[in-house]
Amino acid sequence: MNIVYNSKHYHVVEYPALGSYEVVDKHLGVAGYLQGEVAQVFGESLAQAIAEDPTHDSLDEFLGNFDFLMTQPVRVH
């Protein structure tokens, strides 16, 4: 498990052994689990976004494009 990105708005965790990502929208309180081809494309796109403009604002904007995939409520234990 690798924390790839963390801001006030989003949290992204990579699970390399599974080839998957978990993306959490902290404001909406929802998360999405990406695996397979979707995870591969997401990882490549995220790496490119980080390389082009690694500011929190630009990365949060990029991650906002994936809000529709985040459908699972986040629960705090």
Regions from the language model: what does each represent?
Residues 1-77:
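Polybasic/polar functional segments that serve as interface/processing modules
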